[in-house]
């Protein structure tokens, strides 16, 4: 069968304190509001929303006010993060091009599903301008995160793999040049994030799980 993700209609975004106590609900629109990350200054949130009828990126203030649509292309835009200076966004997108792929995407979305097997990485200004696709690798390229310098992006990809489950970490310049493989171990490495000084990485892996798929 095909690998599918659920897009839950009742997902909303909340603010909680450091102990997990919910302080405020930020979104109330019908449909999927999720995948939220906060800007470096702590004043803005970027998130994925279905409120326009498609899975697009939006921003809002930290208190939930002033929602602004950022992306407009048909397809699933998600997993966005701010650049260290808060001026750019990096995200992964699955954007169907052929009539067959477009029809399949719309059919799945109507059932609250997406098929995230073909995803590329994009960058844009925080207001959506200067949108640029920075990978054309094929397969699934996702979980992007800026290096603290703002000049490189680390991400997870299976573009190199014969089998789809072999995800490794790669780094690429923000303009799409100088692809470099970072990890080689195990079958799954994803969700990388840099330490503030850029010298260390934290990421998820299943390398020590006795050949199971627990991560």
Regions from the language model: what does each represent?
Residues 1-215:
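Sequence signature of WD/YWTD-type beta-propeller architectures
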């Amino acid at each position: 069968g095909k690998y599918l993700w659920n897009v839950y209609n009742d997902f909303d975004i909340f603010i909680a304190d450091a102990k997990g106590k919910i302080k405020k609900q930020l979104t109330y629109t019908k449909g999927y509001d999720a995948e939220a990350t906060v800007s470096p200054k702590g004043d803005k949130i970027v998130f994925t929303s279905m409120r326009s009828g498609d899975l697009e990126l939006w921003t809002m203030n930290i208190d939930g006010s002033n929602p602004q649509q950022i992306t407009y292309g048909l397809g699933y835009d998600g997993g966005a993060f701010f650049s260290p200076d808060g001026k750019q966004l990096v995200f992964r997108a699955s954007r169907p091009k052929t009539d067959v792929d477009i029809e399949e995407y719309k059919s799945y979305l109507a059932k609250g599903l997406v098929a995230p097997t073909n995803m590329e990485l994009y960058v844009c200004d925080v207001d959506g301008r200067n949108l640029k696709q920075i990978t054309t690798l094929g397969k699934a390229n996702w979980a992007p995160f800026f290096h603290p310098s703002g000049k490189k992006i680390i991400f997870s990809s299976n573009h190199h793999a014969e089998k789809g489950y072999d995800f490794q970490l790669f780094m690429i310049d923000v303009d799409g040049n100088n692809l470099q493989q970072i990890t080689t171990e195990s079958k799954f490495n994803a969700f990388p994030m840099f330490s503030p000084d850029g010298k260390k990485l934290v990421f998820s892996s299943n390398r020590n799980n006795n050949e199971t798929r627990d991560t």
